[in-house]
C-alpha cells in the first residue's frame, strides 16, 4: 500500500505538511470539509502544492517530519522543483 507526504497551500498563504495512506484527493477533501480539526480548519480552502509517493508509511512520515523542520524558502523551492536552489539554501544554513 502506498503512502504520500504532501504540502498544502492554505487560504492565508501558509503551508501545511502532512502524510497519509489515503488517496491525496480524499485527504485534501477531508481538510477542506473541516473533518480534520487542526491547523487547516481555519485556513480553508487548501490546495495541493506538492506531493511525493512512498512505498511505506514510515518513509512518508520521516519525510513529513523533515519537511516540517524546513524554512518557508526551502519549501517554496521544493514546490517549484528547484533542486539546485534547495542545495544552495541548505548550504547557506550550514555556514
Regions found by a protein language model. Name each.
Residues 65-78:
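Short arginine-rich
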Amino acid at each position: 500500500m502506498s503512502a504520500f507526504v504532501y504540502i498544502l497551500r492554505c487560504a492565508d498563504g501558509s503551508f501545511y505538511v502532512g502524510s497519509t495512506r489515503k488517496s491525496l484527493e480524499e485527504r485534501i477533501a477531508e481538510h477542506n470539509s473541516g473533518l480534520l480539526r487542526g491547523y487547516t480548519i481555519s485556513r480553508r480552502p487548501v490546495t495541493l502544492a506538492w506531493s511525493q509517493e512512498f512505498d511505506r508509511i514510515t518513509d512518508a512520515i520521516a519525510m513529513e517530519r523533515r519537511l516540517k523542520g524546513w524554512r518557508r524558502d526551502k519549501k517554496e523551492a521544493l514546490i517549484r522543483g528547484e533542486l539546485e536552489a534547495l542545495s544552495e539554501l541548505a548550504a547557506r544554513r550550514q555556514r
